[in-house]
């Protein structure tokens, strides 16, 4: 695959804007597509995202609401929620050239189908090259140009390398991989585990409990990954352990802050602050997939039970602490 000189970013929220900034700093021609008219007009007029106040758009970024214009780019970053990805890719399918890389930048699993993000892309746009970008990265850090490392994966090794090269800048370092499943799985699983860590923090159970929750959560991530074909080095890398460690330690993570609010006793609607964390949607799907393969995931099961109204936070914590003793894996 040749060089990718133009990048379109679909989604003008905080993460989409941050990735557009990164691509522009890497010297790419960047188009930022925003569906919402009000947000698009604000981006054009103010050259600043409502979600990243104080961060000025790079001069080379062109903002548009025309999907066909965005679809002409050499590669497209799809920065839309996991549950609407299929709808967006279906709209893109007739507009893109064959073998255009479509890079999912959401971390989740589709409801009903249990499809990972690249599987959705492959089904909705068979002529495209599916890819995934994931890793420990907050939009505010990336937008400000703070040092960040992520993983970009595609089964097409040349495509993964070309995407990493296209997004590489002085502060944003992408590693490339062909373990698409491992990269996707790490991002989706950590969403649920970060809610658990947030509950521990919100309940003020202490640093020891938070460390235990994060570590045992990683054990669950590895179990799930092995069962679904992920490579062990991927789970120990940026998109697995790296992302989990970050999102289980700071309220900058929406899943962690959502869990903190639940731990303080807030209801789900109040804890969501107007937008539910992706882990809320992923938890029941993750549980179904774990049960289908007989994978023991007690922390994820407890989170799903709390979110489904089947257990109180205190009952979930008690259940985890009173499990039979066992050898450490």
From Swiss-Prot:
Transferase as UniProt keyword: no
Keywords: Cytoplasm, Lipid biosynthesis, Lipid metabolism, NAD, NADP, Nucleotide-binding, Oxidoreductase, Phospholipid biosynthesis, Phospholipid metabolism
UniProt EC number: 1.1.1.94
Pathway: Membrane lipid metabolism; glycerophospholipid metabolism
Residues of the active site: 190
GO molecular function, one term: glycerol-3-phosphate dehydrogenase [NAD(P)+] activity
Localization terms from the record: Cytoplasm
Principal location: cytoplasm
Region forming the signal peptide: none
Purpose of the protein: Catalyzes the reduction of the glycolytic intermediate dihydroxyacetone phosphate (DHAP) to sn-glycerol 3-phosphate (G3P), the key precursor for phospholipid synthesis.
Family the UniProt entry places it in: Belongs to the NAD-dependent glycerol-3-phosphate dehydrogenase family.
UniProt-recorded name of the protein: Glycerol-3-phosphate dehydrogenase [NAD(P)+]
Annotated gene: gpsA
